[in-house]
């Protein structure tokens, strides 16, 4: 799915979800702490490189581009026992601000409400929107077959894996590990929020709450596990509090680690990625050296921070941004630039594997998730997409599913399509099974595990019955082909972050039934 269209899902959902507090009760207080006083130089890491400014994705007239300004060197002094003063950068401002101390408990938290302006503007089956994360939803053509393909449900893993000499890393294949995950859910619109230019004094918590989420507590995370989910995908925008030399603020890293810790302690798997991250991805075709330097620094730091974590933590190379329409537009009918665009993604994914494998600790054996081309099924199954070389053979591929986009994305008609309010015809089901059979044949049958890192549907113009039918059908058909389905969710759409439970019990039951 392409990244522009999923913005519309979130933009449609967000107004009803912008909350003012987190009221979830906790057995113990969860505290977020930051240094007593850290000076923040609000200048982007790119400001010294004079990269031409592109319009932000919050501007609906642009195509997911963002100002990658000049790079300015700053020295970051870190100690474990003293206060730290560091020059840091944040998007689009040159004023100096103070990164004030935050002390937040689980029972009393103010969540920042953000008003986002959304405009659907697309051409050739694309919708550009704002407010949240971005996705391109493309409707993959169904196979020309006249009957729906059938798939035999694979057998479950026969025996429990043994633990290797490396602490926390079991002798388990990635295919077995993905199967063990079961079904999952995303912690969406939380740690990946970005472009929060309305926040004058950016802090860890202000980013976390900028798109409507309350401060995440341990009880919220435990609630996902109690619902029955086996894996929590944690999207992260790492550039939010980053110095000019691409050093991630230690408090930002600590907060991600805290949420990962809660996830693992609850018994779930965790997936951590680079998620959109303010749009610098768009510059890879024109400034690959600079972008690759930033990408490398981010993954070096993540790998180091989590190097001793067990195999229940998986890294994902990127989100949906691996595809560049400035080089190749699939709707143009031309193949010019296609090989180059695929080549950039293949290079990024190989760099990702190489960085993690050389990082030490448990990383040489860590299971990794490789983002497909725009995480689109049809494009990821293209022969130009190549899985990276990995001597450990511990890589899975990630695809997303928002097909048909007129049903999953649109809540009202657009110039590229008519909003669809129902799903479930023989043609609809065949499209789903054809797409998943394609993934199975291209990857699963060749020994490459698959995680459906996102699937979802806008809810505003659909009945609960239609929402249940679509989501449960995707989960069931995916799981029956050994694909792990991970539901895209943002604050209080499906999971209530105040009550720490799933809002529609019948929908949850049907999704979990995919495993039976």
Task: Identify the function of each model-found stretch.
Residues 34, 38-163:
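Extracellular mucin-like PTS domains
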Residues 427-504:
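Substrate-binding cleft of secreted/luminal carbohydrate-active enzymes
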